[in-house]
Amino acid sequence: MASHIGKLPVTIPAGVEVKIDGQSFTAKGAKGTDSYEIPEGITAVVEGNEVVLTPADDLRPTRAKHGLARSIVAGMVKGVHEGYAKTLEIVGTGYRAQMKGKGIEFSLGYSHTITVEPPAGIEFELPNPNQVIVKGIDKQAVGQCAANIRKLRAPEPYKGKGIKYADEHILRKAGKAGK
C-alpha cells in the first residue's frame, strides 16, 4: 500500500529546470531558485517532464514522508514557476498600512505603529491602505509571514475589526442584549 499523494508524479512546466543530486532537489524557474533535502528512504527521479518519487520500503513512516516529500516538491515547482501570494485585508476605522522602505508600517489602534520587515525571499505589495499582498516563491514562508501579520491584530468576533485573509469569513457574535 503506497501513499496516495506520493505516488502521483509532479509535472515540470516549461521554463522550470529541475536538478537532483543524491537527496538534494533543486528547482529553478522564472521567479527564482529553491532547494529541498529529500528525506532518507525516498528517491526522486526525473522521467521526461515529470518528477517521480518512490519509497524504499512500505513502512508507515516512509509512506508518510513519501507524501510529504511529493507535496513539498510540487509546491517548489509551482513556486519557482508562478510564485505564491496571500492577500490580507485590514478592517476597522483608522486601521491602515503604508510602505516604509521594503517593509510595512501598520496603524492598528495601538498607541504606537508597528513596522514589519519582509523576511528573505518575501516581498510586500500595498494596492491600497487596507490591503496587503505577501508574495514569494516559498509556500511555507509566504503563509507564515501572512500569519505573523494577521497575528498583529486578529479579527474580533463582534465588529470584525482586525487583519483577516481576503478569503476568510469571520464568525460574528451577537452583542450583549440591552434592557
Curated annotation (Swiss-Prot):
ATP-binding keyword on record: no
Q: Name one GO biological process term.
A: cytoplasmic translation
Which Gene Ontology CC terms are recorded?
A: cytosolic large ribosomal subunit
Does Ribonucleoprotein appear among the keywords?
yes
InterPro entries from the entry? Ribosomal_uL6-like, Ribosomal_uL6-like_a/b-dom_sf, Ribosomal_uL6_a/b-dom, Ribosomal_uL6_bac-type, Ribosomal_uL6_CS
Q: Name one Pfam family in it.
A: Ribosomal_L6
Instruction: Describe, as the record does, how this protein assembles with itself and its partners.
Output: Part of the 50S ribosomal subunit.
The similarity comment for this entry is: Belongs to the universal ribosomal protein uL6 family.
The protein here is known as: Large ribosomal subunit protein uL6
